[in-house]
Amino acid sequence: QHALEKGEECNAVALTRKGEILYSYKRGAKLVTWDHQVVWDYKTPDKTELQSATLLQNGGVLLGICGVPAQFIELDKKGKEVNKVTLNLEVERPHSQFRQIFQLRNSNYLIPVMAKQKVLEVSRKGKIIAEYQIEGKAFSSLELPDGNLLLPCGDNHCYIVIDRKTGEELKRVNALDIEGVALLFVGQILQLKNGNLLICNWYGHTKDATVDEPQLIEIDKNGKVVWSLHDKKNVGKISAACYIDNFRLPNLK
């Protein structure tokens, strides 16, 4: 367990090939070892928020900094800046801009702009390749095997799938569509090796104290729940997750 400091919030977490932990904490992003040693700490200036820290295909890191303008910065494995894109998202309040930014298989960036209810595909040189208007404030994104985009829509209590070529909405799963659970704030959604989806069901904006739902929900291809984590006492709110397969903890002795 690695504790966040007071005032920090983590909306992105990943495990590197070396077994180090990458996470964002709003005022920056850190890469730490399993025994809490800081490899690097990238701090962001005042009036900005570093909400996204995700892995690139080459093992580097993509940072997403909310601000005017927004910044998307690539770091190499040693934490050195190797590419930077600045973009005016036309959203003055940094906290309303985005949460998770991922690199697509074609090396472009996918940027869900919450306040504008749209998703941008942007090249590494800062050119807008595609723009999708959606019905929902997307927290994150998942590039599916067929190239289409799955978008978790936060406080809209749903996730959608859109056609990558046309932007058409192909599927929408609403709050009560999954038998046995209810979707609250839909955070990151991951696809596991078996094709199942793992949904982060964040409850931070839930106003009704009687609402009690799992923090993590795994569903199969038919939309049936096959596993869930329901332990608010020991775990708390979950907006982001990292799927670890065949990983062994390093010897810390």
Predicted regions and their residues:
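Histidine-/acidic-rich catalytic cores in large beta-rich domains
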Residues: Q1-K253
